[in-house]
Amino acid sequence: MPAVYGARLTTFEDSEKESEYGYVRKVSGPVVVADGMAGAAMYELVRVGRDNLIGEIIRLEGDSATIQVYEETAGLMVNDPVLRTHKPLSVELGPGILGNIFDGIQRPLKTIAKRSGDVYIPRGVSVPALDKDTLWEFQPKKIGEGDLLTGGDLYATVFENTLMQHHIALPPDAMGKITYIAPPGQYSITDTVLELEFQGVKKKFTMLQTWPVRTPRPVASKLAADTPLLTGQRVLDALFPSVLGGTCAIPGAFGCGKTVISQALSKYSNSDAVVYVGCGERGNEMAEVLMDFPQLTMTLPDGREESVMKRTTLVANTSNMPVAAREASIYTGITLAEYFRDMGYNVSMMADSTSRWAEALREISGRLAEMPADSGYPAYLAARLASFYERPGKVKCLGGPERTGSVTIVGAVSPPGGDFSDPVTSATLSIVQVFWGLDKKLAQRKHFPSVNWLISYSKYSTALESFYEQFDPDFINIRTKAREVLQREDDLNEIVQLVGKDALAEGDKITLETAKLLREDYLAQNAFTPYDKFCPFYKSVWMMRNIIHFYNLANQAVERGAGSDGQKITYSLIKHRVGDLFYRLVSQKFEDPAEGEAALVGQFQKLHEDLSTGFRNLEDETR
């Protein structure tokens, strides 16, 4: 090997001199087989060829290693060198993650664009994930020299932006007695801010730590989740709730609105931080997120308006990027989410879409000549999905002070043709606890969010009962009644198609009208209007209460109006006499949350009382 070439190889960011090289024996798309790799480890990071392409070892046989390369492999030749790094694929964790956009292996795309001046990522580019030159305001906790620290202890705070405080924790595997802690001031992430001594050995720590992406970060214990993930979407919050620390799947055909729901969750949910992973989806969708999010603001409890981007991290791995990196992007995203969870934050991770990730697994599996299972996917597809979906949850964090955090995963699934029997969808549904099934027919009718209320479900309803009891003791009964009305409407639709609506009993006509109210004016929501883009939970509860109140009063009036001399109160009479109240029920969604909770609740209460009065007068008149 020429000396010049050897010198060039060691200039990438790992400054340690490497002594062991393998050489390329075979190239098949993103899969490379290298010989002379004795002593290499599974999932070890390697640099392949003259361009130092990033790769990861996924199979070992004797001294040959099979490597999946995360960049375009065109131009690789037999006998090209393969450089080992003796470490797994890891991410850098520290101040500077929020507001940034990375690719699937945590390379900062903004920095690469500035340095290369190109719209595409150059091959073999090596840029630190986090900026090493930026100075951060470091504020140590009330600890000093001689104090003991153990893994997970928070020892300082960095003011990352005006929205988020970044707590600096000791890496989980470290412990010892403090021999030095930096005074308050400005430091970069590579400056030493802490020194510990353990069994006579001193070790220095910076604000930067690395963590292998395939290894879950340790926690003290897992806890039962009991706080709802409030999304601002009525159909999700009221009928199919998730929890902070839950797992949700959004399967749906193309054009059903999966990405819009994912983005709405990122914008308006009650999470402290959001990791949005665009995995194998169109580049325009990530561009849309990059354009929209910086302009979106959220109102804090103290009245301040802050940009949503200040709590968001984007991992973009679009469909025109190398296939292998899709697999890494999901693990990169969940590791970043776990890092913020360990600070005591509630984090949401949006994976859009896990189907593309599974397709990447299928392609790599095919290149490895593994035995295919259903639809050509590998037999271990369900195991890989399960290992990803078991990483979220509500946890008690390691170290002190005592704190809890959570990671919630919302995974969009894109089954071909909207077929829910697809292997990825089937495997996902057997794992997740919340299923928000999107319906192509609803989307074609322009009913958004197009969540089908007949096939969707949530297994967290029981876990959240204590929260609902405190918030509003009537809510559980109201929700049960609303579900019954929607289910009854589905049963009646077949009869209506056969004999027509006029042949139905008066009570059934009321059921159909109430179900229409629920469908068109409660479950449907316009994400592009100021009054309906986000619906607070109190507004969702009051809207449903008034609709079900109308249903109960109308049924009661019909029953009381039925006598031996015929039906005095009919559905058409109700519609005629209380038409103005009916219009006010339809118009509830136009109430703007910006007016404040007290004003809105007052208006909803007045409508509730007016409904009772209107039906009482109707019954009195017809006696």
Swiss-Prot record:
Lineage: Eukaryota, Viridiplantae, Streptophyta, Embryophyta, Tracheophyta
Top-rank lineage group of the source organism: Eukaryota
Physiological role: Catalytic subunit of the peripheral V1 complex of vacuolar ATPase. V-ATPase vacuolar ATPase is responsible for acidifying a variety of intracellular compartments in eukaryotic cells.
NCBIfam families per UniProt: PRK04192.1, V-ATPase_V1_A
Protein known as: V-type proton ATPase catalytic subunit A
HAMAP family tied to this protein: ATP_synth_A_arch
Subunit structure and binding partners: V-ATPase is a heteromultimeric enzyme composed of a peripheral catalytic V1 complex (main components: subunits A, B, C, D, E, and F) attached to an integral membrane V0 proton pore complex (main component: the proteolipid protein).
Pfam families: ATP-synt_ab, ATP-synt_ab_N, ATP-synt_ab_Xtn, ATP-synt_VA_C
Key word Transport present: yes
Reaction(s) catalysed by this chain's protein: ATP + H2O + 4 H(+)(in) = ADP + phosphate + 5 H(+)(out)
Binding site for ATP: 252-259
InterPro entries, per database record: ATP-synt_VA_C, ATP-synth_a_Xtn, ATP_synth_asu-like_sf, ATPase_a/bsu_AS, ATPase_F1/V1/A1_a/bsu_N, ATPase_F1/V1/A1_a/bsu_N_sf, ATPase_F1/V1/A1_a/bsu_nucl-bd, ATPase_F1/V1_b/a_C
EC number(s) from the headed UniProt entry: 7.1.2.2
Organism (species): Vigna radiata var. radiata
Annotated GO MF terms: ATP binding; ATP hydrolysis activity; proton-transporting ATPase activity, rotational mechanism
Family membership: Belongs to the ATPase alpha/beta chains family.
